[in-house]
């Protein structure tokens, strides 16, 4: 039986990973007390015993854990500390045909950011196949449930909801300095050479994410259609069980004309939609920011690293 230690099990992502793994009989979860977590020797000992360690920590704390002396185990880091570090494998199995194998053999895997996952998967095939130039200037808009901000933001929103239900915070843009911490990985793994203009927002609901990427026809290297874009993206992910690429202008996926950012909650699924007409095209990704965008992705990577069925413990 494989032994797994979650370093930072009390946070939003750590709790959900623990919840998923506790239900399995092929994994033993190792634990230490909160007090012992602050004692380097105790933490080193449990890490040394583990077959894999999942870091659910702030960036600096994640770097410190990896740097502990005498640790010869495999790491999955759910923070953004190592996502563009060439010494770490990017934990997005669907990125290309070789990424799963890279994860299987890796000792250091960096779990992708939720926004980056939703952006990279629809955009990378278009750049890889020459439909979009790598120097394209793209814009990205997205909305996520407030759980994406961790325990502090969850508490703020739920307090507001209970104390002032008549004054709900609706969709609220943030990161208006245009320096969101997911941007470096969005650039690196999409194949772009320049940062997209990324404007995320938080919605007044717990979880679920929707990212939209508008594309004008003049951005493309040659004349394209929604059908051609669909074929390009669908061909990339036709064997990926977690990714569904919907046919162009799939109105059956809408709820009375609306796209629901919560439609994939509780799953490890990501849906890609293509809407538009000849001169304007809109790509939309929908995923659970706590599932495929965080805890589900970590479990998927863990399964690959430990030689287990890739989707063990996951709902697709």
Task: State where each predicted segment sits.
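N-terminal Rossmann-like NAD(P) cofactor-binding subdomain of oxidoreductases
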Residues: 1-174, 264, 275-277, 312
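Active-site-lining helix/loop region of Rossmann-like oxidoreductase modules
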Residues: 7-14, 40, 124, 128-253
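A residue-level signal for beta-strand positions that form part of recognition/binding surfaces
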Residues: 26, 89, 137, 195, ...
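Short, well-ordered turn and helix-capping elements at secondary-structure junctions
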Residues: 33, 96, 200-202, 287
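C-terminal active-site/capping subdomain that shapes the small-molecule cofactor and substrate pocket
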Residues: 214-316
């Amino acid at each position: 039986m494989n032994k797994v230690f979650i370093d930072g099990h009390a946070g939003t992502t750590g709790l959900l990973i623990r919840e998923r793994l506790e239900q399995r009989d092929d994994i033993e979860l190792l634990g230490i007390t909160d007090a012992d977590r602050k004692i380097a020797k105790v933490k080193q000992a449990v890490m040394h015993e583990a077959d894999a360690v999942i870091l659910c920590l702030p960036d600096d704390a994640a770097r410190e854990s990896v740097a502990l002396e005498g640790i010869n185990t495999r790491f999955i880091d759910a923070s953004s500390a190592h996502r563009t570090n060439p010494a770490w494998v990017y934990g997005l199995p669907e990125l290309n045909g070789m990424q799963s194998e890279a994860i299987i053999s890796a000792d250091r895997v960096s779990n992708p950011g939720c926004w980056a996952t939703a952006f990279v998967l629809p955009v990378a095939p278009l750049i890889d196949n020459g439909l979009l130039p790598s120097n394209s200037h793209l814009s990205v808009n997205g909305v996520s449930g407030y759980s994406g901000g961790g325990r502090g933001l969850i508490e703020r929103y739920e307090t507001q909801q209970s104390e002032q239900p008549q004054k709900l915070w609706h969709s609220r843009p943030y990161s208006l300095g245009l320096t969101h911490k997911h941007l470096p990985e969005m650039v690196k793994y999409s194949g772009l050479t320049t940062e997209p203009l990324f404007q995320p927002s938080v919605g007044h609901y717990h979880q679920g994410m929707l990212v939209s990427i508008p594309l004008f026809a003049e951005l493309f290297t040659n004349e394209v259609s929604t059908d051609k874009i669909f074929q390009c993206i669908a061909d990339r992910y036709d064997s990926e069980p977690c990714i569904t690429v919907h046919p162009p202008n799939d109105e059956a996926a809408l709820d009375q004309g609306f796209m629901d950012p919560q439609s994939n909650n509780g799953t490890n699924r990501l849906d890609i939609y293509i809407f538009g007409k000849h001169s304007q095209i809109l790509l939309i990704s929908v995923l659970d920011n706590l599932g495929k965008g965080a805890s589900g992705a970590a479990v998927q990577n863990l399964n690959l690293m430990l030689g287990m069925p890739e989707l063990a413990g996951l709902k697709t």
